[in-house]
A protein has these predicted regions:
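Gly/Ser/Thr-rich phosphate-binding loop
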Residues: 268-275, 285-347
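Conserved ATP/PPi-binding loop(s) of AMP-dependent carboxylate-activating enzymes
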Residues: 354-357, 364-391, 425
Length: 520
């Protein structure tokens, strides 16, 4: 792993502004446990953790980690939004490990790649959730690895060679000195190459992000975040694990999305903040109307991660009269690139907001960004070559323009990514798997607008075995090959040929336009 490689001027500015500091998240948790030991940081159903309990359990688990794997190893967790994930996250940080959250919706195919690519040394998984046996999946996947990780099962029964979370010793050990500029988190993001890429963040890149949202989103000590978004995303992890320690908030976790349950939790726990992609806001608005509540405690709803309708923002802002409802834009690489428009109701609805600490520019229509919250780079340095321009700006692959010179509007993507319910799906990854189907000669997967999910994945197929496979056939094939369910196409059409240019490149923009026209 590496430390942050930044332009000297940018580094000096980040430290000078206080966005980068010489302390770490582990230092902050130690201070919180000392100064406010009984302050509640996490709510997970009936389980409530205060600062002292979180610190004690995290440092105890850190000791258990250090007795089994070396410092600076990669520690993964593949858990629902459970409080145990917070303990693991802070334990890995205190032990000087690199934490790697993994989506529980991934299956053998994706998991095997991540474990090998990041050389994961320890992984925490649930037993059985939603009818899926994670312990058995880990046994299958790790059997093929040359250096299998230690597998720890949370809320379930471990299989042979695996450990039970509750049986791990909790004796604190001497933790190594921590470098705030060193890598401490790897998050995998879908790439246009079809191969997921590991995004590297440091203590300080995340610290800068947290300080930014603390300044702009009406967050005070005692604010409470409802966290239904997956904690394996950078958004879910910062609101569940970072803000409670660094900003004095409380995280209220939801391990399974239910809009009526979310409204009940927002009310019972007096939640002041929530973030989520478009479907979350749509569902919360409908559920609140059914319950005849305007959620008087809600102060801020941050909406991003997928295409957002201006009318939805306006309707929600009218209904939740006390709340700021605003669009934002960001990525795993440069999280919270814009902070929304919390002080301008119109711009909050019809733009994606103004930049906060990020320096944003548009070159030939493409949005580029750099700043103290930017990734250190990708796990494999060769992936950095095309990701950054000569001035150190991250090439987002998204298209946009400015309104009034200050507010960004994202108009589309140059990158070939489908965003469904806020989840990035790499079409090429799924296409490569489906080309193994005997009835598929050619395939192109594109995202088409969907009022419920933002986008849906549509597979356009050329076959020499008419009528060709249907949606059910593709889903059966993808399930058998271990591809996560959220990546499965929801629509299949069969064409005689795919549109291509003279070089033979498939013209996905034409495919998308034809499908959209057919929907109208």
């Amino acid at each position: 792993m590496r430390t942050a490689q930044r332009d000297a001027e940018l580094t000096a500015r980040a430290y000078g502004s206080g966005l980068w500091v010489h302390d770490t998240l582990a230092d902050a948790l130690t201070a919180a446990a000392r100064d406010t030991p009984q302050r509640e940081v996490l709510v997970d159903g009936p389980m409530r953790l205060d600062c002292a309990t979180l610190h004690n359990r995290a440092t105890g688990l850190a000791g258990a980690m250090l007795t089994r794997i070396p410092a600076a190893s990669v520690v993964s967790f593949m858990l629902p939004n459970w409080h145990e994930a917070a303990i693991i996250y802070h334990a890995a940080t205190a032990a000087g490990m690199v934490v790697n959250p993994i989506l529980p919706s991934l299956r053998d195919h994706e998991l095997a790649f991540i474990l090998a690519d990041a050389d994961v040394r320890m992984i925490f998984v649930p037993g059985d959730v939603g009818g899926h046996d994670y312990a058995a999946m880990l046994q299958r996947v790790t059997a093929a690895l040359p250096h299998p990780p230690v597998v720890v099962v949370v809320r379930g029964k471990p299989l042979t060679g695996q450990l039970a979370f509750d049986s791990l010793p909790t004796q604190p050990a001497s933790a190594p000195a921590l470098d705030p500029d060193a890598v401490r988190m790897i998050l995998y993001t879908s790439g246009t190459t079809g191969r997921p890429k590991g995004v590297l963040h440091s203590h300080n890149s995340i610290h800068a992000l947290i300080r930014q949202i603390g300044r702009h989103w009406l967050i005070d000590p005692g604010s409470a975040f409802l966290v239904p978004s997956p904690i394996a995303h950078i958004g879910g992890s910062i609101y569940a694990f970072e803000c409670p320690v660094l900003l004095g908030t409380t995280a209220v976790l939801m391990d399974r999305w239910d809009s009526d349950g979310a409204v009940a939790l927002l009310t019972a726990e007096h939640c002041t903040h929530m973030t989520g992609a478009t479907p979350f806001l749509q569902a919360i608005l409908a559920a609140a109307q059914r319950a005849n509540t305007r959620l008087p405690d809600l102060r801020v709803f941050i909406c991003g991660g997928a295409s957002v309708s201006p009318q939805l923002i306006r309707t929600a802002a009218d209904y939740f009269e006390r709340a700021v409802i605003t669009r934002v834009y960001g990525s795993t690489e440069v999280p919270v690139t814009t902070i929304g428009a919390p002080d301008d109701r119109d711009r909050a609805a019809d733009t994606d907001g103004r930049p906060g600490i990020a320096d944003v520019t548009i070159v030939d229509g493409e949005i580029r960004a750099r700043g103290p919250q930017m990734l250190l780079g990708y796990l494999h340095p060769e992936d950095d070559t095309d990701a950054f321009d000569a001035d150190g700006y991250f090439r987002t692959g998204d298209l946009g323009h400015w309104v009034d010179g200050h507010y960004l509007v994202v108009t589309g993507r140059a990158k070939d990514i489908v965003i469904r319910n806020g989840e990035n799906i790499s079409p090429k990854e799924v296409e490569d798997v489906l080309l193994g189907h005997p009835d598929i000669g050619e395939i192109a997967i594109v995202g088409v607008p969907d009022p419920r999910t933002g986008e849906r994945a549509c597979a356009v197929i050329v076959t020499d075995r008419p009528p060709g496979p249907d949606v059910g056939d593709l889903r059966d094939f993808l399930q058998a090959t271990g591809v996560a369910k959220f990546k499965w196409p929801e629509q299949v059409v069969v064409w005689d040929a795919l549109p291509k240019n003279d070089a033979g490149k498939v013209l996905k923009h034409r495919i998308r336009a034809r499908l959209v026209d057919a929907d109208e």
